[in-house]
Regions:
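A polyanion-binding, active-site-adjacent surface
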Residues: 2-222
Length: 222
């Protein structure tokens, strides 16, 4: 079904969302998602994870190879970078809900071997998946929304948003009281050498420290 040729198989996400959703019921419904063609090659839906009381929601692009196999977001190499950065920034992992704008892994096979190569999701696939993210936002109601990478930032803040120019800025939004965009942790792993990797990690942690400052300066809601 490459290229979305079997449109009749698609089911709008809005038709799957429960009338009175919880994070658990949303995850159960998302397991049957057929909103675009990505479900065909993906192992499973990878829904968001974290407490409904999370003060921070972090949104990436899509699950990777490890996440697709495990069924959990941010458990691969990029997830380990994120966990380390959160710890260095002083953010409690229990205060964080992590998810992606797209819930299925988009990939293509390598020229040789069985390796699955990440491919950036197409605009219509991101749009098809948006209702899941909107439902997550409505339930969690984070104090700070963190967009990890350009796909997440442009999906949530508009196509004109530039992470390069506006990285690390805390901006108000209808989505959350504060929104901050930064790089995706996978970009740190792609750094050409150790020195660059350490430099990019420091910048990433500095961005997350701004989030930590917001949490520290504003009392946690009861």
């Amino acid at each position: 079904m490459a290229g979305g040729s079997k449109i009749g198989d698609y089911v709008p996400v809005t038709a799957l969302i429960p009338r009175r959703p919880t994070l658990v019921s949303l995850q159960e419904a998302a397991a049957h998602c057929r909103g675009c063609d990505l479900y065909v090659k993906a192992t499973q839906t990878v829904f968001g994870e974290g407490p409904a009381s999370a003060r921070v929601m972090m949104v990436g692009e899509q699950p990777g190879d490890r996440e697709d196999l495990a069924g959990k977001p941010f458990v691969g190499p990029a997830g380990r970078v994120l966990d380390e950065a959160l710890e260095q920034a002083g953010i409690d992992r229990d205060d964080v809900y992590v998810t992606n704008v797209v819930k299925h892994f988009r990939w293509e096979g390598a020229a040789r071997g069985k390796r699955r190569i990440h491919k950036r999701p197409r605009t219509w696939e991101i749009q098809a998946c948006r209702a899941w993210l909107d439902a997550e936002l409505a339930l969690v109601q984070p104090e700070v929304l963190v967009c990890l990478g350009a796909s997440a930032a442009q999906s949530l803040l508009g196509r004109g948003f530039s992470v390069t120019r506006q990285r690390g800025e805390l901006v108000p939004s209808s989505l959350a009281p504060k929104v901050l965009a930064t790089v995706h942790p996978s970009s740190i792993l792609r750094a050409p050498d150790s020195e660059t990797r350490h430099s990019e990690m420091r910048k990433f942690v500095a961005d997350l420290k701004k989030v930590a400052h917001v949490l520290a300066s504003e009392p946690k809601a009861a």
